[in-house]
Each structure stands twice: as C-alpha cells, then as structure tokens.
Regions:
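Active-site/acyl-donor-binding loops of N-acyltransferases
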Residues: 61, 108-153, 208-310
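Conserved acetyl-CoA-binding loop-helix of GNAT-fold acetyltransferases
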Residues: 78-81, 86-101, 233-245
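Basic, Lys/Arg-rich alpha-helical nucleic-acid-recognition elements, primarily the DNA-binding modules
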Residues: 29-32, 58, 78, 100
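Acetyl-CoA-dependent GNAT
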Residues: 50-54, 58-67, 210-216
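A conserved beta-turn-beta hairpin within the catalytic core of GNAT-like acetyltransferases
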Residues: 64-76, 86, 214-224
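Extended, composition-driven regions rather than compact fold-specific motifs
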Residues: 39-45, 53, 258-260, 267
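Conserved GNAT-family N-acetyltransferase fold
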Residues: 44, 55-57, 74, 79, ...
Length: 310
C-alpha cells in the first residue's frame, strides 16, 4: 500500500471490514476517490485517540440528467465503522457533516445501493427513500451474437479514436425521470477501475459492457454491467445478442444482469435473493425537495456500472 496516499488509512479500514482484495493495495481508492473527472470524493473520517481510523463515509460526485437538463449529483459509496466503535453514532456524525458538503456542489440529492440491513436503518432513521431491490436475472445465450464485436478494454483502447467515437453520444436516449449522465471522459474513467477487467460488445444498436465473475454454485458467468443504446437504435433494444457476446468473450456458459434499463430488455430467470450473496437495495436521499422531491423521485436506468459493485 502507498502510505503517502491521502486514502491509505481509509483503504486499510475498508480492506479489514469490507473487501480485502479490492482495498488492500490502495489503488482502488486512489482511482475511485482521487481520479474521478467529475470531482474528488467527498469524505468524512473519524480517528480514535491513537490516530487509528475507526469511521469512514465517502460519496462521489457525478451528474444526472432529467427532461430539463443535467445537474450535479452524488453517488453514495463506502461506509464503514470499526466493530469496537459501533452504536456510538459515528455514521450519524459523519452523515450530518457530509450532507451539506455534498449539497454544496449543487447536487439536489444522492443515490446508491445498500444491503437490506443497512437500507432499513438509513430509510427509517435518516429519511432516505427505498427505490426498490436491484433485480438480477440469470440468462443463457439463445441467439447468435450477430454483428457484435468484442473489444478488451485497456489503456491503449481508451486513448483511441475508436473509443472516443463509440462514446461520443452515450446520452442519446430520452429520459423520463432521473438517470446518470454519461460521456466519453466519465466512461473512460469508470473503465479504468483497477479492480475489474472489462470487455465492450459493440453492435449495430448498442454498446454493452461485461466482466467475468461466478454465478450460482460457482459457475463461471459473464456479468453484463451496462447497455448503452446507440443513436438511431429501435427502442427498446433487445439484449439477446449482447448476452451471447458477453458469454463468448468471458468464456462463460451463463450470464447475469443486474438492475433495470428503461430502453433495454434483458430476458432471463429472476435470481432468488437466497442465491445472491448480498441483495442490493437502490436508495435515494434528497437535499432539495423543490428540485428533487422525494415522493416523485424515480431512476429510469440503474445497472451495475452505475454503482461500484463491478
């Protein structure tokens, strides 16, 4: 771990409590918190008297769009408190400091995912809204991936004219309520995640993003993390050819898709929550009820790449 990183102590805490593989080296937070083109992470930390980090809450600036245009927004990310310091109100202390700082960038609210236990706490005690469980479907290739090219993502590809062209109009589809806004710079940053290796699947009506993981019973699985309809596509895009391409590229017999997309249809069998290691709930908190009223807030599209699972 790079001890000179401003996130070194936080990486150590998150490695101990959340995910050792992802956080231990420190590279993930240097990227996720420090290299975001939409702004560095807004963080609140609590250390004990000996200087050990015992509490952390981090949120990440992004942009959302509505029919009226785009606005700064916030993705709520990592929360951790040392087991020895729990039930001391550390999350409340950090949240009360971070909310006004997040609102200060012009964001009317924040959204993210939480497990069922944590979501119950923030909904009941902190005024967040439950936007629904993030569904997951299990599917297999049933059509040939006709017309779809697979591109392994690396630094050279992300710096290429081809990537710039593919990512030139990611927000081409209409929006009804709220949705994360994407452009080439933001997608390029997102695909530089040091914890994942992505493949793009470029077809006539969409660009999909996949990674390799394991599904139920440890079966190798392609995970479709995002589907971007291309300009001129007939909506909704039927994702069968992209599922097949993802399985081909990831050398997996099955595919998992999580979330929902207002302009894409992914057919499959819903994965029961008992087979999911950590079922996720999509949650929202408003900072400005005039701009983002809680009762009416909806997200058109939420997929794995809109969060930080992959």
């Amino acid at each position: 771990m790079n001890r000179d990183s401003p996130y070194a102590a936080t990486s150590e805490l998150l490695a101990d409590l959340l995910n050792d593989r992802r956080f231990r080296s420190g590279e993930f937070l240097d990227w996720f918190y420090g290299a975001n083109p939409r702004g560095k992470a807004i963080v609140e930390d609590i250390d004990d008297d000996a200087g050990k980090r015992i509490g952390h809450y981090g949120v990440v600036p992004t942009r959302y769009r509505t029919p009226a245009g785009t606005t700064p927004f916030i993705f709520t990310s990592n929360v951790a408190t040392d087991p020895g310091a729990r039930r001391k109100g550390l999350f409340r202390e950090m949240a009360e400091r971070i909310y006004p700082r997040a609102a200060g960038i012009g964001a009317p609210g924040l959204a993210g995912t939480s497990n069922a236990q944590s979501s119950a706490v923030i909904i009941n005690r902190f005024g967040w809204k439950d936007l629904g469980s993030m569904p997951a479907v299990f599917t297999v290739p049933v059509v040939w991936p006709r017309g779809v090219r697979d591109i392994r993502v690396d630094d050279a590809f992300l710096a290429s004219d081809e990537f710039a062209a593919l990512a030139s109009d990611l927000d081409c589809v209409p929006v009804r309520d709220w949705v994360q806004s994407w452009d080439a710079e933001f997608l390029g940053w997102r695909l530089r995640n040091p914890d994942s290796t992505y493949t793009l699947h470029v077809g006539p009506d969409a660009v999909a993003v996949s990674v390799r993981d394991h599904g139920p019973l440890g079966i190798p699985a392609a995970v479709v993390c995002k589907v971007f309809p291309r300009p001129g596509a007939k909506l909704p895009v039927v994702a069968g050819r992209y599922v097949a391409a993802a399985c081909r590229a990831q050398r997996a017999p099955v595919c998992v898709y999580g979330g929902w997309n207002a302009h894409v249809r992914v057919r499959g069998v819903k994965v029961p929550e008992r087979f999911r290691p950590s079922p996720l709930v999509v949650v929202f908190k408003s900072f400005d009820e005039d701009r983002a009223p809680t009762p009416a807030f909806r997200i058109d599209t939420w997929e794995f790449l809109d969060g930080d699972v992959y």
